[in-house]
Regions:
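Macromolecular interaction modules
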Residues: 1-144
Length: 144
C-alpha cells in the first residue's frame, strides 16, 4: 500500500533531527564536494515541520507516494535494517510524457525489469511525486 510522505532535497548535507527536534529519514551524499550532484541530501518525513526547512537551501519540496518494490516499506525498517549504502536518483520528466503515463511505465515496465536485471539489490523504492511545491520538474525519486 503506498504511503504519502514529504520529500525535501537540499543542496547541502542536513542534520534534520537537530534542526527540527524530530527524527526524519535523512540520506546524505558521501561525495565531496557535492556541487556536481542534483542534490546532496534527501529527507523523508510525514511531519509538517519539514516544510519549515524549505527556506534553508532547499532545492525542492515534494509530496511523494512510496512504493516498496523490494523489501519492506521504509517506515517498517529498523535502523539496522536500512541499507548501508543507498543510491538516490531523480526520475527526470520526459517531454511529452505526462506524470501518470510515466508512473505507469515506471511501475509496470521499468520496476520489474530492474528487479530482474539487478539481482544483487537488497532495497528498491520508487517515490512517485504526486505534488511538487517547488523544485525541479521530476516525476519521482528512486532509492536503490
Amino acid at each position: 500500500m503506498p504511503v504519502l510522505k514529504l520529500a525535501a532535497v537540499f543542496a547541502n548535507r542536513r542534520d534534520t533531527q537537530e534542526e527540527t527536534g524530530e527524527e526524519h529519514l535523512t540520506f546524505n551524499a558521501i561525495a565531496d564536494p557535492t556541487d556536481h550532484l542534483p542534490f546532496a541530501s534527501l529527507v523523508l518525513s510525514a511531519s509538517p515541520k519539514l516544510i519549515a526547512l524549505n527556506e534553508q537551501l532547499c532545492v525542492g519540496l515534494y509530496l511523494v507516494s512510496e512504493r516498496a518494490m523490494l523489501n519492506r516499506p521504509l517506515d517498517e525498517l529498523s535502523h539496522g535494517d536500512l541499507p548501508a549504502s543507498v543510491g538516490i536518483f531523480p526520475v527526470i520528466a520526459k517531454p511529452g510524457l505526462d506524470a501518470s503515463s510515466a508512473d505507469t511505465h515506471w511501475r509496470e515496465v521499468h520496476g520489474p525489469l530492474a528487479l530482474k536485471v539487478h539481482s544483487a539489490m537488497t532495497h528498491y523504492y520508487q517515490l512517485q511525486i504526486v505534488h511538487r511545491s517547488f523544485g525541479p520538474a521530476w516525476h519521482g525519486l528512486v532509492l536503490l
